[in-house]
């Protein structure tokens, strides 16, 4: 018998002072049985960083041909493709050719550093690719926010993401390994 995804609900209030964007959203995240709590919370953080009414989570781990989240336009084109982890060159190329903008969130300190050394020059070929890195310590702190029902406040200013709920406060500094040219 196949294991089912665990459903998480998040009510998120985003005040993105860098983009002058303010948004309240009720999100549903399906955590695949093979997905860690840290990875699920990184998906949520990626959504917060690029918050938009049209930004949607996809089937994620269940669908190899889709990103973790995407922002589709009215013509069904992909304006933003959000990827997590350490994808191979083929996956990066696919994302960068199908979407106007691609945001990759790398994590897992040791593996990510090695992956970046091996893929940095290949990633530089894609002018629409952003590569963000979140270290293990911040990712562990972020995972403490995980709850089946979450109410989160997020403020983004000067590149920092301030996240809070009824119990926790956290400042997250994503490291920009690559920005679009």
Curated annotation (Swiss-Prot):
- Pfam family of the protein (one): YaeQ
Q: Which residues cross the membrane?
A: none
What protein name applies here?
Answer: Uncharacterized protein YaeQ
Species per Swiss-Prot/TrEMBL record: Salmonella typhimurium (strain LT2 / SGSC1412 / ATCC 700720)
């Amino acid at each position: 018998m196949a294991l089912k995804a665990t459903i998480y609900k998040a009510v998120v209030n985003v005040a993105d002072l860098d983009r002058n964007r303010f948004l309240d959203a009720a999100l549903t995240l399906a955590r695949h049985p093979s997905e860690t709590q840290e990875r699920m919370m990184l998906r949520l953080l990626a959504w917060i960083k690029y918050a938009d009414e049209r930004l949607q989570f996809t089937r994620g781990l269940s669908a190899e041909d889709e990103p973790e989240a995407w922002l589709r336009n009215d013509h069904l084109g992909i304006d933003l493709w959000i990827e997590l982890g350490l994808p191979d060159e083929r996956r990066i190329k696919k994302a960068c050719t199908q979407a106007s903008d691609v945001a990759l969130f790398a994590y897992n300190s040791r593996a990510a550093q090695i992956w970046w050394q091996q893929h940095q020059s290949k990633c530089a070929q894609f002018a629409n690719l952003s590569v963000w890195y979140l270290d293990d310590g911040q990712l562990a702190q972020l995972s403490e926010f995980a709850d089946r029902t979450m109410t989160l406040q997020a403020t983004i200013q000067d590149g920092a993401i301030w996240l809070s709920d009824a119990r926790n406060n956290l400042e997250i500094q994503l490291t920009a390994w690559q920005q679009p040219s």
